[in-house]
């Protein structure tokens, strides 16, 4: 049963008659779209929220993104983009809180969100779109209070992560498993990024297949596009003659940057003459259970005897990151699991082949043998084999580069927004199941 605030039912009916929402409340409790991807809890989810909101606004849908305030100096609201407002919600101390500790502040976030919305006219929002299970928990409560549908994107699934844990990584706690199950069971519509995730939601979480929409994330094809490799190498300080192997992302066990370092060491063991022309770059910052990882990676590089061939760079904004992609000979994505893998898509859009783990969404993001290589197995040797093939065959690499641009070209954010908007329309349908 819905608890519908006075006036909300009439406005909801208007949205149903229009067949599309006018305003969407986007929930991203644990990480702000204004944060720099690649550090802390900021990553692909942040990019997703920003770019989806941008495209929805371009389609005439107003978006308000609600996120937890981590500083008293943050404004209550800020315009992120035309038609997109970020609301900083007071819930818990004004500081970063480990994601594992955030469930304690769900009630406070929910209450603050309800207070913030009370300043609007009744029925202001037509749809709630929650991101990650924490926001989904808030979304369930708020959707019932407002009498509007909840659309949920998981981004990652605890059961999948726990089934592919890295050494030194912590399993997702029982509280998340239970909370995630509740959100998946209670949302009006679910968005899956890939056919794999669609099957996981149905097979592992008992989601009804007719409530799940498959909509792939996108890439900003205006920013991430081919460019002059020599110019980009000069900008990031890489020798024009080097083979550059690039890792981009949060430094945490799940992303497995250590596997790239071990594979590079294996390449040099097999061919010591390659040493003078091989560079490995790791662009990103620590996150979650990987807080000790940067120091550990530095020590690992020293242990492997490749410190002189490895560069550690802080997270870079898109305008700088694009030059790293263009400068790279190959981008390596050796993750234990990925719901999609936006880094792989961004790299390919720049014309750089990707060598990625054959897991999860990477099997959708990378076309094996067309835009890059998918690697089965998690040993340094199998990654070294794939990288060696790529480095020794420049003509084949050039074909992969062309294939990468063509493949990524099919993943624009505009297509993502239209797919999400279709899901919103389904959620607004009079036949949609109530939260």
Swiss-Prot record:
Keywords: Glycosyltransferase, Magnesium, Metal-binding, Transferase. 1D-myo-inositol 3-phosphate binds at residues 30, 41-46, 99, 132, 156, 176. The keyword Transmembrane helix does not apply. The keyword Magnesium applies. Mg(2+) binds at residues 325-326, 328, 352. It holds the Pfam family Glyco_trans_4_4. GO terms for biological process: mycothiol biosynthetic process. Homodimer. HAMAP family: MshA. This is D-inositol 3-phosphate glycosyltransferase. The gene is mshA.
């Amino acid at each position: 049963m819905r608890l519908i605030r006075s006036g909300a039912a009439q406005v909801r009916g208007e949205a149903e008659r229009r067949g599309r929402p006018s305003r969407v409340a986007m929930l991203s409790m644990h990480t702000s779209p204004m944060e720099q991807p690649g550090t802390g809890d900021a990553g692909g989810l942040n990019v997703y929220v920003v770019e989806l909101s941008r495209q929805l606004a371009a389609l005439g849908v107003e978006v308000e993104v609600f996120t937890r305030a981590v500083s008293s100096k943050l404004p209550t609201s800020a315009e992120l983009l035309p038609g997109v407002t970020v609301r900083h919600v007071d819930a818990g101390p004004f500081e970063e809180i480990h994601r594992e500790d955030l469930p304690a502040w769900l009630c406070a976030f929910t209450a603050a969100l309800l207070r913030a919305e009370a300043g609007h006219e009744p029925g202001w929002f037509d749809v709630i779109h929650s991101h990650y299970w924490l926001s989904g928990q808030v979304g369930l409560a708020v959707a019932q209070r407002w009498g509007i549908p909840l659309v949920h994107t998981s981004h990652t699934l605890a059961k999948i992560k726990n089934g592919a844990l890295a050494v030194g990584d912590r399993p997702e706690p029982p509280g998340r498993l239970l909370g995630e199950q509740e959100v998946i069971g209670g949302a009006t519509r679910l968005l899956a990024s890939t056919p794999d995730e669609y099957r996981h939601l149905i097979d592992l979480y008992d989601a009804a297949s007719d409530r799940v929409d498959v909509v792939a994330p996108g890439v900003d094809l205006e920013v991430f596009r081919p460019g002059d490799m020599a110019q980009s190498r000069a900008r990031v300080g890489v020798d024009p003659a080097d083979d550059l192997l690039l890792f981009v992302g949060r430094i945490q066990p799940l992303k497995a940057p250590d596997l790239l370092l071990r594979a590079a060491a294996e390449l040099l063991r097999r061919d010591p003459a390659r040493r003078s022309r091989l560079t490995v770059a790791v662009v990103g910052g620590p996150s979650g259970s990987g807080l000790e990882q940067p120091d550990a990676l530095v020590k690992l590089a020293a242990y492997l005897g490749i410190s002189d061939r490895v560069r550690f760079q802080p997270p870079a904004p898109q305008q700088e990151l694009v030059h790293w992609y263009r400068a790279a000979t190959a981008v390596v994505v050796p993750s234990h699991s990925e719901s999609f893998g936006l880094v792989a898509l961004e790299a390919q859009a720049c014309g750089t082949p990707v060598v990625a783990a054959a897991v999860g969404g990477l099997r959708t993001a990378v076309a094996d043998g067309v835009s890059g290589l998918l690697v089965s197995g998690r040993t340094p040797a199998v990654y070294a084999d794939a990288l060696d093939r790529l480095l020794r065959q420049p003509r084949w690499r050039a074909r992969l580069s062309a294939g990468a641009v063509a493949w990524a070209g099919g993943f624009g954010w505009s297509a993502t927004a239209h797919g999400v908007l279709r899901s919103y329309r389904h959620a607004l349908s009079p036949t949609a199941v109530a939260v």
